Amino acid sequence: MSRPRRPGPEGRQPTIKQVAERAGVSPMTVSRTLAGGSGVRPEVQQRVLEAVQKLGYHRNENARSLRPGHRSGLIGVAITNLANPYYGTFALGVEEVAATYGRRIILGNTGEDADRETQLVADFIGRQIEGLIIVPSASSADHLGPDRIGGLPAVLASRRVYGLELDTVVLDDVGGAYRGTRHLIESGHRRIGYLGNVLSVFTGQRRFSGYERALTEQGLAVHPELVQRGQQDVESAGAALARLLDSDDPPTAIFSANNRNTIGALSEIGRRIRGGTDPSRLPALVGFDDFELADLSPVPLAVIAHDPHQLGAEAARLLFHRMESTDPVPARTIELPVTLRIIRP
């Protein structure tokens, strides 16, 4: 049986003609805009894209190649950072489970950008994916609501979106950050800095909560000047640590909320050691997420370890369970455990 078309906000799939009418342009202009915008003025492109979003229109890229009664065999996987090896391992976990069900994955990168994520999901749906696994870039996501994706089975991985009844796989973010920060406190540190995501990101909020809880339980203040948020890559994380270390009263230890921040911090520490700084004068680190070459750290280091392959595999299993269910099943949330791995005391 062929898959039903995804409904738009009014309960049916809008046509390219309806998009053109709403934008006040020709159907050809809509097609050219969606194909990259060559020869279309920017203000016209903006009107077309607004109409596309308002109507919930999706290009059906596979319509000509799919024969009636045939499935695409595709699972869309949207991640936030293709440059992060963590997500390569995550995607491998998804792919291996998908292969056992005779499906293939198509992978897309959102760059932690909500608009880019919205377009990526629309592109996936246009390719007639059978299911979606997504690491959401924001705590709100209207483009994942039932009026936008219809009955498409979808699973959220690593992060929850409040208000959406979708199957979700997350990590013990709060507990992991708490244990990591407690480890630093028990090692004698009192001024502990923080590198992580903004609070609007689900994991950013949860991991900061664990850090904050560990400090307050021990009667230690959370100093705003020791908190650096919003770093998305190694370079910006290194710069964030440099700001902390160059302050009048620098931290003696750092809790880092993800591997990009940890690697960036270690890069800055290495730069200072090469410049002649004694390693004993540099901060100890605990980082959320294990990573390759962690054992080469020149300063005390521990990581909150978990398996991104398992995270991807669990998300895929939830998705295929949802796809194969013949009766309505309430949305499930699975929280995977994490462990503290002390690499260099």
Model-derived segments and spans:
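Bacterial carbohydrate/catabolite-sensing allosteric modules
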Residues: 1-9, 54, 96-101, 149-156, ...
